[in-house]
């Protein structure tokens, strides 16, 4: 039998930490899975004008410095980017327009890569692996006769929503209406009807809705879709896509992919301070509050959380992302005397090493914004979640893990930070009490899912097999 040609894959991730980290971890997994088949993974990195490019590049390089088979190519900046007013009004539309302007830059990069090869080369470029925001670049792959795959850093349930948008648009319906509290829809892969109000906020404005639909329309053009989830977690959704409805592309459940390092310029002294404090706490006694790496809470909301933590009197670790417009450090915005009153009971920090924290025996609950990476990390260690979604698809994630999967405690399902509502201290305190002391927390089920997640990526597990199927199909 002739030796199979080695493959190179070109990854184009979305340039924010959660997406970049998941992409790097996927690249490592593919190479380690079949090192004789996956020779190289090239990452084409790009940035948005308002993101700190130098920090991100340094971060990327640190993640791959020991990975000789992963290489990084930084694309030039886009000339004449869309106006920032569009981002403020409809961020999804801005991102899609920006990616379209990247087409000539990606074309040049691919042309250079491919022109350096000849027919006798033992390594061939097998395809593009695109973040779902980058689906306009499928056109560039087609120009070079390269198949495109989509890497979905979100859930299989999110993929069901994208399939729903595709079907809905065939009926030429306008953007959705959030004001109808009673309205529910049937989403592929869901057992329960889905309330409209838990869909991404962008679906309720014309410009962003059109961008979402445009992305959904490109998904069927992919040769396959890689999803950071696993069969035991989202069985109904994966069963739906296994049936290949409307000749939809093959879907590969390749998760859970966990990201161990989520911060450029890692502050080791802060990490050590946090972990040392946790070491001194009793088992399962600490509630961890963390709301992601992209957005900061309003100063008034910070004060309500602080009041809630005083009310419940439970040990806590609270990560506060600062907002330069309102406060440069947590101490500036916390209520007067708060730190003295909770001394010995709680710890407030800026950045926190989330995976290490969730893995720590002292953690007994997690109040989370419900980013998909955070959900997978919490499930991996069997830590109960109280849901407080903020933006993007987090409301749908919250609905999925509370109502569809029965794996989390509902604090809020449809909260959207940009609408300006302040959640009051009493409500937060009640959720924290229920999370840490309540009988409704599905601890046995969480333990089973944690074990299933471990088994999925082991030799012979469902995600292990899915990765093999993907590589064999290159």
From Swiss-Prot:
Keyword match NAD: no
Source domain of life: Eukaryota
The keyword Glycosyltransferase appears for this protein: yes
GO MF annotation, one: quercetin 3'-O-glucosyltransferase activity
Pfam families per record: UDPGT (PF00201)
Keywords recorded for this protein, A-Z: Glycosyltransferase, Transferase
Binding site for UDP-alpha-D-glucose: 293, 352-354, 369-377, 391-394
Chain segments annotated as transmembrane: none
Documented EC number(s): 2.4.1.-
Entry-linked InterPro entries: UDP-glycosyltransf_plant, UDP_glucos_trans, UDP_glycos_trans_CS
EC class name: transferase
Functional summary from the UniProt entry: Possesses low quercetin 3-O-glucosyltransferase, 7-O-glucosyltransferase and 3'-O-glucosyltransferase activities in vitro. Glucosylates other secondary metabolites in vitro like vanillin, trans-resveratrol, curumin and etoposide.
Family note: Belongs to the UDP-glycosyltransferase family.
Designated name of the protein: UDP-glycosyltransferase 71C2
Species name: Arabidopsis thaliana (Mouse-ear cress)
